[in-house]
Amino acid sequence: MGFHFQGAESIISADGETVVKKRARKAYRIEALDLKIINGRTKREAKILRKLEALGIPAPRLISTYGDTIVMEKVEGTVLKEMIDSSDNPGALFRDLGALVSRLHIADIIHGDLTTSNFIHGSKIYAIDFGLSYISRKDEDKAVDLYVFEKAVGCAHDAKFLEDFYCGYMGEGSESVLKKLGTVRLRGRKREAMAFG
């Protein structure tokens, strides 16, 4: 069964075993600049998908890429957010998710939009939607990735499950990232205080 979805950044359609993601043009940008930005982002996302496959990290397999379009394998399963909402043991799902995000960060992949809607639960948990992703070795970037996730969880789920998430996340390189996360949280609280003060 196929589907067609248009978001702010791309048009996504799926049929059979493949998903086609075509980046949307921005009418307010000069056409030549728009094409350069779109093609650059498409190449970056394709590069990350190749790296994920090479490392054995669960994510859609890249089939082909051209210009503004990526063709990838369709991942069968349920959006993780829905699975968590109906699960008798959501803590276990959050621990598995933490372990997967840890693998991304160990590989220096910053997802850029960590929410439970950007993971699919099938035979395992798969990370999807790498449209905002990039490569970085900086603890700061990994910490911001986690901070965005914390905010998303606070809006969609019970924040108590973050403890399970971090149980799964703990491992290689996590100590320095979590230390930096403390600084990022403090900065976020100061911004919020200024906004409401």
UniProtKB/Swiss-Prot annotation:
Positions with a binding annotation for ATP: H4, F5, Q6, G7, A8, E9, S10, I11, I12, K22
One GO cellular component term: chromosome, telomeric region
Keyword field contains Transmembrane helix: no
Entry annotated with the keyword Transcription regulation: yes
Taxon lineage: Eukaryota, Fungi, Fungi incertae sedis, Microsporidia, Unikaryonidae
Gene3D superfamilies according to UniProt: Phosphorylase Kinase, domain 1, Transferase(Phosphotransferase) domain 1
Keywords recorded for this protein, A-Z: Activator, ATP-binding, Chromosome, Cytoplasm, Hydrolase, Kinase, Nucleotide-binding, Nucleus, Phosphoprotein, Serine/threonine-protein kinase, Telomere, Transcription, Transcription regulation, Transferase, tRNA processing
Family statement: Belongs to the protein kinase superfamily. BUD32 family.
Residue ranges of domain Protein kinase in the record: 1-197
Official protein name in the record: EKC/KEOPS complex subunit BUD32
Described purpose of this protein according to its UniProt entry: Component of the EKC/KEOPS complex that is required for the formation of a threonylcarbamoyl group on adenosine at position 37 (t(6)A37) in tRNAs that read codons beginning with adenine. The complex is probably involved in the transfer of the threonylcarbamoyl moiety of threonylcarbamoyl-AMP (TC-AMP) to the N6 group of A37. BUD32 has ATPase activity in the context of the EKC/KEOPS complex and likely plays a supporting role to the catalytic subunit KAE1. The EKC/KEOPS complex also promotes both telomere uncapping and telomere elongation.
Matching Pfam families: RIO1
Catalytic function, reaction form: L-seryl-[protein] + ATP = O-phospho-L-seryl-[protein] + ADP + H(+); L-threonyl-[protein] + ATP = O-phospho-L-threonyl-[protein] + ADP + H(+)
Localisation per UniProt entry: Cytoplasm; Nucleus; Chromosome, Telomere
Written domain comment of the UniProt record: This protein is considered an atypical serine/threonine kinase, because it lacks the conventional structural elements necessary for the substrate recognition as well as a lysine residue that in all other serine/threonine kinases participates in the catalytic event. BUD32 has protein kinase activity in vitro, but in the context of the EKC/KEOPS complex, the catalytic subunit KAE1 switches the activity of BUD32 from kinase into ATPase.
Subunit relationships: Component of the EKC/KEOPS complex composed of at least BUD32, CGI121, GON7, KAE1 and PCC1; the whole complex dimerizes.
EC number: 3.6.-.-, 2.7.11.1
One annotated GO molecular function: protein serine kinase activity
A Gene Ontology biological process term: tRNA processing
Residues at the catalytic site: D113 (proton acceptor)
Species this chain originates from: Encephalitozoon cuniculi (strain GB-M1) (Microsporidian parasite)
